[in-house]
Design a protein with these regions (language model features):
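HotDog/MaoC-like acyl-thioester-processing domains
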Residues: 1-20, 96, 103-202, 206-207, ...
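Hot-dog-fold acyl-thioester-processing enzymes
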Residues: 2-96, 159-305, 369
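Short, charge-rich binding segments
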Residues: 67-68, 90, 102-109
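A short glycine-rich, hydrophobically flanked beta-strand micro-motif that places a catalytic Asp/Glu
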Residues: 308-313
Length: 370
């Protein structure tokens, strides 16, 4: 693929973005505006989550929720367009998110979202020198105007040319495996524990205890495609006329490929040559995808009656196609807050190189033994 010059971060564009800070607008055209059983199931299958609470409607109807209920990470599929992104042509590396969940995300709920640009922080990074950490804040409400959740997400905006020239990840190589190594990894999937209908009581939780790990990988482009099926078109994956119309409005969101066709910058997740143009050795996962994996550690552990009130995660390193991940957690604290019984949990994920690529934490409300 021919190397080209990409746009640069300018003072004028930063000043323009500063003027947009705090302006709250409608989150337009989300992939999911309604929480339905099918939408929940598609999202869960997109991360390989077989929890029956998300995929078996009859089972979900028998739980305390009296129907399917979505995990917090489902809200990634409810994000929409509208908030100022700015910095046209400057690559966006998704770096993390935080959730505050106020009400269960039950099937049958219609969601209304608003979004605002709430942060623009200059950073000096090893990856691409001057970068800009952007924060967007989403507020999701139901038909009664009750707040369901507040979600913040962060992007590191980096100049593609600088990132490629600095070549921070030149020693990072896509993984390969022998048949016996694949067999060993696949056997670990059988050890996954879904608590399900067996309640996890607050009384029984021990500070320091570890949560059963969740394994993902070795990552394939197929897994990224499955994620997109559940997550949706956002941010730039539009077909034919929709794609052409989006390109006409936002030409800098597309980069011409070797065939002379404008194509989405999102193809870093399935086109290894294009990924190399932005300074990464090969295609890699989506940040929200890995955060959803980490959230699965919680939902597997807490059982059907648990409720995640807070959850945050930061992506620290790339997860290349071919990498395998072990997502884990540990109980840090137990406490009573008014009539709620809460557990604070530390979360992390490591790849086959034993490098920690994602960190996070959560507060989970658990039932008390009667």
């Amino acid at each position: 693929m021919t190397k080209k010059q990409f746009p640069k971060i300018t003072k004028q564009e930063l000043e323009r973005m500063d003027r947009a800070l705090g302006l709250e607008v409608e989150a337009r055209d989300p992939f999911n505006r309604y929480i339905t059983f099918d939408n929940i199931r598609h999202f869960a299958y997109g991360i390989g989550d077989i929890n029956p609470l998300y995929s078996d409607e009859e089972y979900a109807n028998s739980t305390i929720w009296a129907g399917p209920v979505a995990p917090p990470s489902f809200l990634f599929s409810c994000f929409g367009r509208g908030a100022p992104q700015g910095l046209k042509g400057i690559h966006a590396m998704w770096t993390g998110a935080s959730f505050e969940i106020h009400r269960p995300l039950t099937a049958g709920t219609k969601i209304f979202g608003t979004v605002a640009l709430t942060g623009m922080e200059p950073k000096n990074t090893k990856f691409a020198a001057l970068s800009i950490l952007q924060e967007h804040t989403y507020t999701f409400r139901n038909l009664s105007n009750n707040v369901l959740a507040n979600v913040k997400e962060w992007h590191m905006r980096t100049e593609r040319d600088k990132a490629r020239k600095r070549n921070k990840y030149e020693n990072l190589r896509p993984a390969t495996y022998t048949p016996s190594e694949i067999e060993k990894i696949y056997s670990e999937y059988d050890k996954e524990i879904i608590r399900g209908s067996n309640p996890r009581y607050w009384d029984d939780v021990i500070v320091g205890e570890k949560l059963a790990p969740v394994i993902k990988g070795p990552l394939r482009v197929t897994d990224n495609v499955a994620w997109k099926i559940g997550w949706g078109f956002r941010p730039f994956t539009y077909a034919h006329k929709l794609g052409v119309e989006y390109y006409k409005k936002h030409p800098m969101a597309y980069i011409t490929n070797d065939s002379g066709i404008p194509d989405t910058s999102e193809r870093v997740h399935w086109d290894p040559q294009f990924a190399q143009l932005v300074g990464v050795p090969s295609s890699y996962d989506f940040g929200p995808q890995r955060v959803a994996w980490l959230c699965q550690v919680l939902t597997n552990w807490m059982g059907d009656e648990g409720f995640i009130t807070k959850f945050w995660s930061e992506v620290r390193r790339f997860n290349l196609v071919g990498d395998t991940h072990w997502l884990e957690g540990k109980v840090l604290k137990k406490e009573k807050h008014h009539d709620k019984h809460l557990v604070t949990i530390e979360l992390w994920g490591k790849d086959q190189r034993e490098e920690q690529t994602i960190t996070g934490g959560a507060t989970v409300e658990l039932p008390l033994r009667k």
